[in-house]
Amino acid sequence: METVQLRNPRRQLKKLDEDSLTKQPEEVFDVLEKLGEGSYGSVFKAIHKETGQVVAIKQVPVESDLQEIIKEISIMQQCDSPHVVKYYGSYFKNTDLWIVMEYCGAGSVSDIIRLRNKTLTEEEIATIVQSTLKGLEYLHFMRKIHRDIKAGNILLNTEGHAKLADFGVAGQLTDTMAKRNTVIGTPFWMAPGVIQEIGYNCVADIWSLGITAIEMAEGKPPYADIHPMRAIFMIPTNPPPTFRKPELWSDAFTDFVKQCLVKSPEQRATAIQLLQHPFVKSAKGASILRDLINEAMDIKLKRQEAQQRELDQEDEENSEEDETDSGTMVRASGDETGTIRVVNTMSDGANTMIEHDGTLESQLGTMVINTEDEEEEGTMKRRDETMQPARPSFLEYFEQKAKENQVNSFGKNVSGQTKNSSDWKVPQDGDYEFLKTWSVDELQRRLSALDPMMEQEIEEIRQKYQSKRQPILDAIEAKKRRQQNF
């Protein structure tokens, strides 16, 4: 377990004072290491010099969506709960905004699952869910919707206390705007109402919590193995997801998930109600999480030490080669001017240790919708809520991705190719013998073309469905208007 000796044990950091905020951040903090990536920026571990307290600092490039960043800071400033990550202050440094937050030494729940390569037990899930519900109860009382609840956004400190984090897509719910109409969140955790853009309120977080409970129990959310585009169509139309092997879980846990995953928001339980559920009320204290936290932190430390040993070994080998090369000068044969050739074997960045841990969440990211004049690649930002899209705006994201895939797939022309991959169609007769005559490069290009083709077919099906559905909706609306006139 990580311990930090405070230089001034009588004083704990609560908020950065005015004097600290007028200084350069390096004068106030010692940045120790990079922890990972959050919404809109990188997160670092640092020490507050005056108190010795460990903090987390999110460094966000100023060219990122400043409106979203300011919203995140505003929401964190307003929150004061032991179940929500605390905010201490922020700085502008060169082209970055530094956001100073509470440090949770054990990392996220998804980090722990990944490091241990084990899912959680019911007891462990109940304890985490209880703290998460208390955090949601507080946020919802403050009329705020988190909108991105998942295991990757539930952080644990070394004592086992769970806290909600990453407010990059959180929203304020005002009395004049009882429901929101923007598609924001991470696809597989989205509530049906969020996907359909029919308006949603705080209980959208409850659906995401139910999906997160399944994620903690099974290691990944439902539909994680299929294309996100298909999942987005399946979530609103299919029955609520359940455990793959229900017999492995207690009736109380199964019922809790069932209460979270009610498709109708009006019938879905609230955070206050779920805190009284038998599964949650039976939860044990945070101390039961310490063993798994210690195990995960030990694994992480051993991996870091192993990586450092490898880097040190590479440095030694490179240093030996560099010394050998630098001590040998070779005169070019027959060249009277004496050309000296020097071989540089030192690789750039040999002393930099970067951890690349691929997780489901990092691959998925967070979906936020673009306004029409934005062209941010790979990240979708929030749509202006005053606009009335003619169709679900999340489709714009996949259409943009399809275009990018087509550019990446077909933009590189190879000499000798007689047929463009974009002209290729999947054989309808099932005869694929001709594939044997193609090169590996050609086969790879054809394979990369399949996803855009599939998305195009799905879009065509969606349009046909909409063309049949809309007249029915219009007829229903017309009948309602006639009834109102009587």
Swiss-Prot record:
Q: Where is the composition biased (Acidic residues)?
A: 312-325
**Domain SARAH, first and last residues per copy:** 432-479
One GO biological process this protein is involved in is: regulation of MAPK cascade
Keyword RNA-binding in the entry? The reply is no
Kindly list the cofactors needed. Answer: Mg(2+)
Keywords, A to Z, come to:
Apoptosis, ATP-binding, Coiled coil, Cytoplasm, Kinase, Magnesium, Metal-binding, Nucleotide-binding, Nucleus, Phosphoprotein, Serine/threonine-protein kinase, Transferase
- Which enzyme class, named as a word? transferase
Molecular functions per Gene Ontology: ATP binding; metal ion binding; protein serine kinase activity; protein serine/threonine kinase activity
Q: Which family does it belong to?
A: Belongs to the protein kinase superfamily. STE Ser/Thr protein kinase family. STE20 subfamily.
Among PANTHER family, the record links this protein to: STERILE20-LIKE KINASE, ISOFORM B, STERILE20-LIKE KINASE, ISOFORM B-RELATED
Q: What is this protein called?
A: Serine/threonine-protein kinase 4
Taxon lineage = Eukaryota, Metazoa, Chordata, Craniata, Vertebrata
Name of the gene this protein is made from:
STK4
